[in-house]
């Protein structure tokens, strides 16, 4: 089962409750804008004929938050009040009405009693489900068909060497034949997911020091009963259990994988030494160096709750996963669900002036050498949904002398480039409408009500 990721409007990690009780939605604005930028680029690829059939990788899907308990209900209502008056989120709906929730999430309401006031939900209909595996294959095929690009599969970069002329010598292994060959280049871009940190360390640049990685597997339970799958049509987030890190927020999602509609619940984190799903059990240990061991130890001391949670997840059986699912879907039957292991993510651990040694970085991190000859993309959530914004950041930070020349072409691909979708409501609505049409998503605009 391929690991799927998407920007979730409902993810409350991006709307943080402040000490005074207010809700800060600034991160939600930023992430939402970045996702709108990604949609523009994908829409351009469709319009220009570089990829086809957007419904093979993106579907419209409501995003919903569902909570129980007085404190959680109050939080969700305060969150709704903070978001509803901002144009990006003004289509948000909120209810504590039992019958209304039965319309939004009928499967999840089966077996529940109407206790009034202990449950609440909020909903935005403009959410999406994105299959990044399908999108990646479409983009790779487009590059493969281009006369200007060579795409090599089953090849692995095994080492780097800085040459006296300033170029980089890249050593590459053909995993089919075992042959190793070399290639010289002026610039290195390392975008290898969980494998990025070991590759960055091989460059030996100073910026690769004092950082490490914490590998986490993702497990999901997937529904195998078509009748159950058809009763749910949303991505629904809950609230993280008390005493657990915010990254543990569970969700029950309608997903489209290889053209088939399915239903997933999770994730359940599972720690292990591999940096990649099919990596080596020595990955983590090989990444521990004299120059980063103090960073890793500091992270362990600072993040005891996360480590405890991860250990608890390792020993969780399918029965434990099903018990967790029943807090969402009380009528869930064991025989209708199957446990799968998805991909890997490697949370970046680094030293910072603001947070000291061993800070776990939640989010993507761009690392570049002082001379900008090495650029590495590290980290995780929000991940793929913001990848286009990250690519633009890489270009702007490392090739500033070219950005003015590139701007017209970038504007053609991403019409909002250089402008703010957060501060310009008219532009935001125009862009949303256009990308909705380009990607065949449908469109709902409160301004037209």
Language model features with spans:
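Dinucleotide-binding Rossmann-like beta1-alpha1 core, especially the glycine-rich loop
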Residues: 11-104, 262, 274, 282-283
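Flavin (primarily FAD) binding-site architecture
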Residues: 190-205
């Amino acid at each position: 089962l391929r690991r799927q990721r998407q920007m979730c409007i409902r993810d409350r990690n991006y709307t943080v409750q402040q000490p005074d009780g207010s809700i800060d939605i600034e991160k939600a604005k930023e992430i939402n804008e970045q996702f709108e930028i990604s949609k523009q680029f994908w829409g351009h690829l469709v319009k220009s004929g570089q990829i086809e059939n957007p419904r093979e990788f993106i579907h419209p899907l409501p995003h919903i938050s569902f909570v129980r308990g007085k404190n959680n209900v109050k939080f969700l209502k305060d969150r709704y009040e903070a978001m509803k008056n901002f144009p990006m989120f003004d289509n948000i709906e909120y209810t504590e009405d039992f019958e209304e929730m039965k319309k939004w999430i009928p499967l999840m309401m089966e077996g529940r009693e109407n206790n009034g006031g202990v449950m609440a939900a909020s909903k935005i209909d403009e959410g999406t489900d994105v299959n990044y595996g399908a999108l990646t294959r479409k983009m790779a095929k487009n590059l493969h068909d281009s006369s200007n690009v060579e795409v090599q599969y089953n090849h692995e970069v095994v080492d780097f060497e800085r040459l006296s002329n300033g170029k980089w010598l890249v050593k590459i292994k053909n995993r089919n034949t075992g042959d190793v060959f070399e290639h010289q280049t002026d610039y290195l871009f390392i975008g290898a997911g969980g494998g990025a940190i070991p590759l960055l360390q091989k460059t030996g640049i100073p910026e690769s020091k004092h950082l490490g990685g914490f590998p986490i597997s993702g497990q999901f339970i997937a529904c195998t009963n078509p009748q159950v799958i058809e009763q749910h049509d949303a991505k629904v987030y809950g609230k993280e259990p008390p005493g657990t890190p915010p990254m543990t927020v569970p969700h029950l999602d309608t997903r489209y994988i290889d053209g088939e509609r399915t239903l997933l619940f999770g994730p359940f984190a599972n720690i292990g030494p591999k940096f990649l799903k099919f990596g080596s059990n020595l990955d983590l240990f090989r990444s521990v160096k004299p120059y980063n061991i103090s960073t890793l130890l500091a992270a362990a001391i600072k993040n005891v709750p996360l480590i405890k949670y991860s250990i608890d997840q390792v020993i969780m059986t399918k029965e434990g996963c099903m018990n967790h699912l029943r807090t969402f879907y009380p009528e869930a039957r064991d025989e209708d669900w199957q446990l799968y292991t998805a991909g890997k993510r490697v949370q970046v651990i680094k030293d910072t002036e603001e947070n000291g040694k061993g800070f776990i970085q939640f989010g993507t991190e761009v690392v570049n050498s002082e001379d900008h000859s090495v650029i590495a993309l590290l980290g995780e959530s929000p991940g793929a949904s913001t990848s286009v914004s990250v690519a633009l950041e890489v270009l702007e930070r490392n090739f500033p002398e070219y950005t003015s020349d590139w701007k017209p072409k970038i504007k053609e691909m991403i019409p909002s480039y250089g402008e703010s979708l957060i501060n310009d409501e008219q532009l935001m609505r125009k862009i949303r409408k256009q990308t909705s049409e380009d990607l065949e998503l449908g469109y709902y605009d409160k301004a037209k009500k």
